[in-house]
């Protein structure tokens, strides 16, 4: 009997302890403050990264792109969205280094740039990592960039599957060329574009001679000497406009009379060979009705078509970030989702901005300009 009493007392004591513990837990639940949602950090200091060649041989591209990106921030950012600029020098290695910095900054919700297709290929693996970072180029045209392998990539200019046939058709039907001399600059941008133009020309019965030169080369005299007397057009799908200018000058020195047709990379004040042509991925916005106030607001001189598309790219990023913040979900994933749903009416490039499922711009086209004295451009196609 005594042992049973002890056991009974122990059980009663244990039950009492358990009851007290449950009561304490219940009180703690009542007294503890309610859990709060994770703070919307991205909207505290929302930032757009900028990547472009601010220095180096292609600095004209980066400076104009940066100027228009800054203009978009001033005009549309509402004083809250910042721009963090990084110089790539049109170099894939430098693009990777600066891209790593942007990806590591939690405040960066989107990137505008890089400028070159080879740079896009360099940063794509970085921006695809955890905390995937959406990015929008204002000038990279390599067709394969939007084949689905880079789902967080967008561009506001048409790709080279449009540029190649547009260029070849003009060379064949308008310039009436029977023989074309093509020189690529050995980059991820130039080679595929040269291939596309070459294929289209050959399909139209045009004789094509193909050559290649490294982008770092600046003396083309030996290459120019290979241009035969029967060549009507020299096609240069290059990114460094100053190199195109040197090439054209050396053609004149050697008495070569073929017409130069340059790709969008030669659409710059650095290339001004009279009588030449450049193919551009954007119109001259000065010729679009309703843009006068916008151009006055920019307040700087611009000589190429590289700047305005970067304004549009930044405009799209700003709109996506604002919508993500309004939804209380300022994450990179939400910004990417908003970019996919982009609809911007009456942009400065003309028309509306929408993206395809793979990030290409809908309905864009290439334009052809003829260069007059001093490089003055006239729209011809």
Per-range role (PLM):
Residues 2-15, 21-381:
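Extracytosolic ligand-binding ectodomains
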């Amino acid at each position: 009997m005594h042992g049973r009493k002890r056991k009974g007392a122990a059980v009663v004591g244990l039950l009492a302890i358990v009851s007290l513990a449950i009561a304490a837990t219940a009180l703690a639940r009542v007294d503890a403050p309610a859990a709060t949602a994770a703070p919307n950090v991205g909207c505290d200091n929302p930032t757009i990264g900028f990547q472009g060649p601010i220095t180096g041989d292609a600095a004209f591209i980066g400076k104009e792109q940066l100027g228009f990106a800054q203009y978009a921030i001033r005009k549309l950012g509402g004083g809250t969205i910042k721009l963090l600029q990084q110089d790539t020098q049109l170099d894939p290695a430098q693009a990777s280094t600066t891209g790593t910095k942007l990806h590591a900054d939690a405040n960066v919700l989107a990137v505008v740039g890089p400028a070159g297709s080879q740079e896009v290929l360099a940063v794509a693996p970085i921006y695809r990592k955890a905390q995937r970072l959406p990015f929008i180029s204002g000038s990279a045209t390599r067709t394969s960039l939007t084949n689905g392998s880079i789902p967080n990539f967008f561009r506001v200019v048409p790709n080279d599957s449009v540029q190649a046939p547009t260029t070849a058709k003009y060379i064949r039907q308008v310039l009436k060329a029977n023989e074309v001399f093509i020189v690529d600059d050995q980059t991820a941008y130039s080679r595929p574009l040269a291939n596309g133009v070459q294929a289209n020309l050959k399909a139209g019965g045009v004789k094509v001679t193909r050559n290649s030169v490294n982008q770092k080369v600046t003396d083309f005299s030996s290459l120019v000497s290979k241009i035969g007397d029967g060549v009507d057009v020299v096609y240069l799908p290059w990114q460094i406009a100053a190199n195109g200018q040197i090439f054209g000058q050396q053609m004149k020195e050697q008495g070569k009379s073929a017409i130069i047709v340059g790709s969008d990379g030669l659409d710059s004040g650095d290339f001004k060979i009279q009588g030449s042509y450049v193919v551009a991925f954007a119109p001259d916005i000065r010729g679009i009705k309703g843009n006068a106030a916008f151009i006055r607001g920019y307040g700087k001189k611009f000589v190429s078509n590289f700047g305005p598309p970067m304004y549009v790219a930044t405009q799209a990023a700003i709109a996506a970030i604002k919508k993500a913040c309004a939804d209380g979900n300022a994450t990179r994933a939400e910004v990417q989702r908003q970019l996919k749903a982009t609809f911007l009416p009456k942009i400065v490039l003309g028309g509306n901005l929408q993206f395809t499922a793979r990030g290409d711009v809908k309905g864009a086209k290439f334009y052809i300009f003829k260069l007059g004295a001093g490089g003055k451009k006239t729209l011809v196609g």
